[in-house]
From Swiss-Prot:
Residues carrying Phosphothreonine: T31
Role description: Plasma membrane t-SNARE that mediates docking of transport vesicles. Necessary for the translocation of SLC2A4 from intracellular vesicles to the plasma membrane. In neurons, recruited at neurite tips to membrane domains rich in the phospholipid 1-oleoyl-2-palmitoyl-PC (OPPC) which promotes neurite tip surface expression of the dopamine transporter SLC6A3/DAT by facilitating fusion of SLC6A3-containing transport vesicles with the plasma membrane.
Protein's name in the database: Syntaxin-4
PTM sites of type Phosphoserine: S14, S15, S36, S117, S208, S248
Major location (coarse): membrane
Amino acid sequence: MRDRTHELRQGDDSSDDEDKERVALVVHPGTARLGSPDDEFFQKVRTIRQTIVKLENKVRELEKQQVTILATPLPEESMKQDLQNLRDEIKQLGRDIRAQLKAIEPQKEEADENYNSVNTRMRKTQHGVLSQQFVELINKCNLMQSEYREKNVERIRRQLKITNAGMVSDKELEQMLDSGQSEVFVSNILKDTQVTRQALNEISARHSEIQQLERSIRELHEIFTFLATEVEMQGEMINRIEKNILSSADYVERGQEHVKVALENQKKARKKKVFIAICLSITVLILVVIIVISTLV
């Protein structure tokens, strides 16, 4: 059993620890000066934040390129290659962030041993918040790509209707899309239909794009699945983190008000002391004058 007499002797300091924790929660990376281990930790946090910003910019760029390709009936190979390169960059950034988050994740043994440590809880808070941001961003990217897939399928469906191939049902269309082979997909469309070469080329291009997109979605999903599960399990902790941060900001604000009031009170107290000192001096002076006059008389 652990010797906790030292903790009992410092029972009065528990509220001070809580106050320190509140302050630690709102410390911005780079502003703390707590020693080498913490400097190294905050440097890693800064790196993760920067990588998340890069990922966010790439996702935004991906969205723009997808809109451009959707608006182009027959996108050039260079456009499709640029889009695929962007997807590859996003996947690599996702892997980098996952590894970086793993590097700052508090070890279970360390967390259990130092559960009441302000430093440990601060590290868990930072890791939880960054993980949540990463998962939300990847979810957004996956949702965006899923919507892009549906729009490509809709373009194929529209082309089939225009070329009198509208007898292909949605179920049959999905089965052809799932075939994974553009040749099989195109040959199925050609059966008993009159499809123009331009329409056929667009349908084939859309199908190829859908195949690449589905591979990208699967790979991206695999990158963050473990982290999404962890964040989901820590959902309650994330909510507590948000609550702690908000209460910390309120605590700091109230602390500033208290300091302001204390300074005002201190100023008033000084004025009172000066006033009392002047009154006493005048009283003593009057007494001295009275005594001197009495002596002369």
